[in-house]
Amino acid sequence: MARKTTGRDRDQVHHQPDIARAAALIADPSRARMLKALSDGRALPAGLLAAEAGVSAATASAHLGKLVEARLVGMESAGRCRYYRLASPDISLALEALAVIAPPLPVTSLRDSSTAGALRRSRTCYDHLAGRLGVGLLESLIEGGLLAGHDGTHRPDEAVRDGATGYGHDFDYRLTETGRRTLVRFGVDLARLPARRPLIRYCVDWSEQRHHLAGAVGAALTARLFELRWLRYGSSPRVVHVTEAGAEGLAGTFGLRPAD
């Protein structure tokens, strides 16, 4: 005999996340390209997002309206211009997770091939570094005695809570005293980092299947590298390039020799 539905049951059903709605919004190829373009945390104009998605300005506006309505994307006005950014870092992490299970897009041009390779080499994961550059930076911090807690490897057969991508939970990295002194000398003001955000976090990198540095320190260190012009954005959103000064600085400061 079927059990009678109670008010508590209805509340539980009502509060279940509407995964299907979010998935349907992301499933559209044009909207997916726009969301990927926004995954580095920057606010981008509608015109650039239209070009990235390969659609007209009117079509892009309609897509962006749906994303704003669903609170996947936020809109900011600056004069007559409208800029869009992801509403939350969690959306970027969700896209990274989908990248693990999604089949690769067919490479139809040299540009597509170059972009895919560049993303694996060095990219942003919302506001911190990922790809081989991000993984290499974390490894250099560990080898230099700036970070402790784990060796940066991801072992799926031993993982308890860590998945193939996204924020990790199995290990507790921490800054050593050497790490604190080094970062302060480098221009990262640890005392002014937002208290609401974990100081140190890590993500499992979807392309490298190792850890890269996240959290307040990961974001602040990445911002400092851009401030020093050791890094610059590429022509495709999220792609990051190491400048000549950056190659020398990363090697001298952190013992990191990026292949870029």
Give a label for each model feature.
Residues 17-56, 82-84, 124-125:
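N-terminal helix-turn-helix DNA-binding core of bacterial DNA-binding proteins
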Residues 26-35, 61, 92, 135:
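Short alpha-helical elements of helix-turn-helix
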Residues 46-73:
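Canonical helix-turn-helix DNA-binding module
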